[in-house]
From Swiss-Prot:
May act as a bridging protein that binds pectin and other cell wall polysaccharides. Probably involved in maintaining esterification of pectins. May be involved in the specific O-acetylation of cell wall polymers. It comes from Arabidopsis thaliana (Mouse-ear cress). GO terms for cellular component: membrane. This is Protein trichome birefringence-like 19. The lineage of its organism: Eukaryota, Viridiplantae, Streptophyta, Embryophyta, Tracheophyta. The keyword Transmembrane helix applies. The chain crosses the membrane at residues 15-35. It is a single-pass type II membrane protein. A motif (DCXHWCLPGXXDXWN motif) lies at residues 388-402. The gene is TBL19. Pfam families: PC-Esterase, PMR5N. The keyword Membrane applies. Belongs to the PC-esterase family. TBL subfamily. Keywords: Membrane, Signal-anchor, Transmembrane, Transmembrane helix. One of its GO terms (molecular function) is O-acetyltransferase activity.
Amino acid sequence: MELVHSATFPCKQKLLIAVTIATSLLTIIPLLYPLLEDPNFFLKQQPPSQSSIINLENGVVTSHDSCDIFSGEWVPNPEAPYYTNTTCWAIHEHQNCMKFGRPDTDFIKWKWKPYGCEDGLPVFDPVRFLEIVRGKTMAFVGDSVSRNHMQSLICLLSQVEYPMDASVKNDDYFKRWTYETYNFTIAAFWTPHLVKSKEPDQTQPKHIDIFDLYLDEADESWTADIGDFDFVIISSGHWHYRPSVYYENRTITGCHYCQLPNITDLTMFYGYRKAFRTAFKAILDSESFKGVMYLRSFAPSHFEGGLWNEGGDCLRKQPYRSNETQDETTMKLHKIQLEEFWRAEEEAKKKGKRLRLLDTTQAMWLRPDGHPSRYGHIPEANVTLYNDCVHWCLPGPIDNLNDFLLAMLKREEDKGFLAQVRKMLS
């Protein structure tokens, strides 16, 4: 089944012209001096940014977020999708729901509407995005859902340009692409636990399917390279459900569902908290990383009628209503992430590091209709396959994560302009 490309992006207003005026002011300040008595001089005729408001009062430039873009509900968007399953090569087969016969298309025709935001959350503008990241680098650090997110971004940007493969190693788990026109590089780093891990030895005839997780050692497969990137988006979640033995100081301290003698079951929540604490510490301790780190919060699965290996499925065709409760596990994982983020953020302020939160858990929890389910493979495939209620169809709800990402990048750009204005006026 092929989707119809149905919309183009509206032109976006330029960011605040206050900075331009401020620059001009420095060269003609004698002529404009009387105008400086007006505290709103830089804001006249200029609407607020969609993600922040800039004020100039008593000679002090300040900014505050105009609303919480992460609290809201899904509303119909008949203009979507903005790419199709036939126009984007970055879609992996198991996320190509249209190709494998998903009969409905309503699940791709929604957008996120934040509560109390006059301008809402604008749909993704690929040109605007590429202008912001011109000459910069961005890394997606995490598991296959992180890669799913990155592939969505590549598909959205394909309306403007296709990237060239710039990978430094022949490994599909560690890929890099460059948008040559914009000198923008995007990369994927595979690290499902964020910390150092050892997979079960599948070659043993009676292997035990248990991971070894070194909770106090960040995975060097990503920490060794983050200094090369301006933006790092980290996430992790579903792999922590798997049975694991926990190590700290290279000594076993407990496990999650390992069912091994003389080892205390500390639950997955213990390991999850420790893994994020270690990942944040690696960012904060890095002398080479000078960029912005974004935590993209947990994107929950939506199995109903059983677990992934017990016939569970996700067959809903509409989003949940905003007042429908999250499951207890998702709520607890989300709470742990926020607590560890806030803890790290306080330390980041002391060190001059920039940590930001993409708190998308509520939005993604409300989308049980967006997973591949049985439509991520050939229907008659003669192999044992499970319904996929973890990853997301492309196009699909995960595209909206990039609406959030662009909004956050705009905020960061606004903060940069504010710093320049303050410097000019000091």
